[in-house]
């Protein structure tokens, strides 16, 4: 699944099956519909924190965001899932705080006096520098949230061991 390319339901894209967002456990249909509307209006999401800001107030909650991360929806943005998981509370809190300030007309920390209180585009999300989850942990998260192994399979590590094994068909 991809936060910018996946639709609500499964779709076929250039002969490949694109995973539907409704199949991700913990992500409601209301959030998915809002996400698709937001992509049409504001274009693709370019960063994780931008996604959280734009989707704030649209049924977005910690559980849904963590499910999207575990399913790999932000992988194509270049983030490590472990770093995102460690930053969820901070980023969601910042998005909610920014939304509250915008409602009250206050400028935020990154606003210039002449920009109407809007955040400057030069701000960039800083994530913790951590090692990524192991391959086994990543595919286990995918299986937990989608019911499928998406980027690998637990038996992949044993493929080389199985290659030299031969077999004979027996007919009785």
Sequence positions of predicted segments:
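Sliding clamp-binding short linear motifs
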Residues: 2-170
């Amino acid at each position: 699944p991809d936060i910018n390319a996946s639709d609500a339901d499964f779709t076929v894209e250039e002969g490949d099956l694109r995973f539907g967002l409704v199949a991700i456990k913990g992500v409601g249909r209301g959030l998915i519909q809002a996400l698709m509307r937001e992509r049409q209006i504001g274009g693709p999401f370019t960063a994780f924190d931008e996604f959280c800001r734009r989707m704030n107030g649209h049924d977005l909650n910690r559980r849904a965001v963590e499910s999207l991360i575990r399913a790999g929806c932000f992988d194509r943005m270049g983030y490590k899932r472990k770093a995102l998981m460690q930053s969820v509370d901070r980023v969601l809190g910042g998005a909610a705080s920014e939304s509250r300030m915008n409602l009250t007309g206050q400028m935020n920390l990154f606003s210039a006096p002449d920009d109407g209180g809007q955040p400057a585009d030069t701000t960039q999300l800083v994530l913790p520098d951590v090692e990524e989850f192991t391959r086994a942990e990543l595919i286990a998260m995918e299986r937990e949230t989608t019911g499928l192994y998406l980027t690998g399979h637990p038996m992949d590590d044993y493929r080389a061991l199985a290659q030299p094994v031969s077999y004979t068909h027996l007919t009785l």
